[in-house]
């Protein structure tokens, strides 16, 4: 089945449209061709989420489109990178996929967590496995370069898959939900749910004393290359604006494995990763068990002797000819255009979003800096609705687990662009770091700490104002 997808250039004039033709084979979509078309249609400036990286699309493929500003050669590399993103990794030797997975892992491919390039989902209850969620582990104190200290037997992430008959999985996690109600000022009742993590069938004994756990759903990949292109100076300017508004937003300071220096964090729920390359190679290593130049050793704590005894799938299981197109793919991902930006209700919701203080952290506009890896991403005006800073979100959202300078109550401001297409892309609208919020209203009501005043402003709004604010969020 062939499906054309249309992408929009920066100035809103669709003079060169890139159509990505996707071929579905065995239930998986692969990019098969790229075509150039001509059109004189226009899109209003208010709909341009990301300048020349904006695309006009409202389907399940909305998060997987190339930026229209790419060259023909870059589009070819994007196509190869998309195939790499879909690639299934297997334990060597096998004829069923690419060698290198494991010995322990949490999946077989990037799409296991980022289905259609979108967000993960939390399981409905303890009987359902964690398909696009994982559990972080650490013990009190700081590790190397100030990173969290891993559990000595299980590392910093529970690995739920091993090699049948050879390497046991580390254990399994179950999520239990408890529900409670919140009353809004006009009498409407909203049900919220709180997760509890249960770790079962631990293969290497009990967890270390003082163990800290945190459930994490995979974030969407919308515009990650543009966020990578935002300069440190722009992030520090965001922190200055935050202080001027009486907020305490601040950047995380983390270890840059690629450049071997301290750097500002920008990726991850606690902004604990400084750049997109490190984010990708870390995910390959920790989630799929795939080694690389930066992670040459298998992910096997010392007690896991069967894991350490497994032969590798190659010298580096993630070689540059495979990694480079995947990295280009991530850097060049486009951002869907806003929808209904001119609608009166949406515009009123935008005003309420600002007047209630939501934009104190969810800043609408950033500008990218010089970006050598993909020059087309340089000096773009973008509207991700994030400041890329850490904020104290209150005790109700605290996970009890610090990460570099991020405390237990601190979370990075999540980008909101593409939010309104989440249900279309992934079939759910689960939000926050562990997917506890099932829609935008629930997510807002979980906000505390620095966001408490904004939450209370929302709680006091009449229903029609709350609906307008949510309509604005759905337009992003």
Residue ranges and their predicted role:
Residues 5, 20-23, 298, 305:
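Secreted/extracellular small peptides and ectodomain modules produced from precursors
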Residues 32-476:
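Periplasmic c-type cytochrome electron-transfer domains
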Residues 1-14:
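N-terminal secretory signal peptides that target proteins for export/translocation
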Residues 16-17, 467:
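Hydrophobic alpha-helical segments, especially transmembrane helices
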Residues 18-32:
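Bacterial N-terminal signal peptides
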Residues 2, 24, 161-162:
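Residue-level detector of alpha-helical transmembrane segments in integral membrane proteins
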């Amino acid at each position: 089945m062939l499906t054309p997808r249309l992408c929009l250039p920066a100035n809103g004039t669709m003079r060169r449209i890139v159509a990505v033709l996707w071929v579905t084979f065995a239930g998986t979509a692969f990019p098969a061709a790229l075509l150039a078309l001509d059109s004189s249609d226009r899109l209003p400036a208010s709909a341009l989420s990301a300048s020349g990286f904006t695309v006009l699309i409202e389907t399940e493929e909305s998060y997987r489109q190339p930026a229209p500003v790419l060259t023909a050669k870059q589009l070819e590399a994007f196509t190869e990178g998309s195939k790499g993103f879909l690639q299934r990794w297997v334990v060597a030797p096998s004829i069923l996929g690419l060698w290198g997975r494991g010995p322990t892992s949490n999946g077989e491919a990037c799409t296991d967590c980022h289905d259609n390039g979108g967000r993960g989902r939390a399981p409905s209850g303890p009987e359902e496995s964690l398909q696009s969620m994982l559990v972080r582990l650490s013990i009190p104190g700081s590790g190397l370069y100030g990173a969290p200290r891993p559990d000595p037997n299980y590392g910093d992430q529970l690995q739920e898959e091993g090699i049948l008959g050879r390497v046991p999985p580390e254990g399994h996690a179950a999520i239990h939900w408890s529900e409670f109600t919140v009353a809004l000022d006009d009498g409407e009742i909203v049900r919220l749910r709180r997760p509890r993590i249960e770790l079962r069938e631990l293969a290497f004994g009990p967890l270390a004393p003082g163990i800290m756990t945190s459930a994490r759903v995979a974030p969407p990949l919308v515009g990650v290359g543009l966020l990578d292109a935002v300069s440190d100076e722009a992030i520090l300017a965001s922190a200055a604006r935050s202080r001027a508004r009486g907020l305490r937003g601040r950047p995380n300071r983390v270890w840059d494995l690629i450049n071997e220096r301290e750097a500002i964090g920008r990726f991850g729920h606690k902004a604990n990763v400084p750049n997109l390359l490190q984010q990708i190679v870390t995910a390959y290593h920790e989630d799929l068990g795939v080694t690389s130049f930066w992670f040459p050793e298998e992910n096997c704590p010392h007690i896991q002797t069967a894991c350490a005894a497994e032969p590798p799938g190659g010298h580096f299981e993630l070689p540059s000819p495979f990694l480079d197109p995947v990295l280009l793919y991530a850097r060049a991902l486009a951002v869907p255009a806003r929808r209904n930006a001119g609608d009166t209700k949406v515009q009123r919701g935008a005003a309420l979003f600002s007047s209630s203080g939501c934009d104190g952290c969810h800043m609408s506009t950033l500008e990218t800096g010089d970006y050598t890896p993909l020059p087309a991403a340089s000096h773009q005006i973008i509207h991700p609705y994030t400041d890329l800073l850490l904020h104290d979100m209150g005790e109700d959202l605290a996970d009890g687990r610090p990460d570099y300078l991020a405390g237990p109550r601190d979370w990075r401001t999540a980008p909101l662009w593409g939010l309104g297409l989440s249900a279309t892309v992934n079939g759910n609208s689960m939000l926050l770091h562990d997917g506890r919020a099932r829609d935008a209203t629930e997510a807002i009501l979980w906000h505390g700490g620095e966001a408490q005043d904004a939450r209370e402003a929302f709680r006091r709004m009449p229903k029609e104002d709350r609906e307008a604010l949510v309509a604005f969020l759905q337009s992003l």
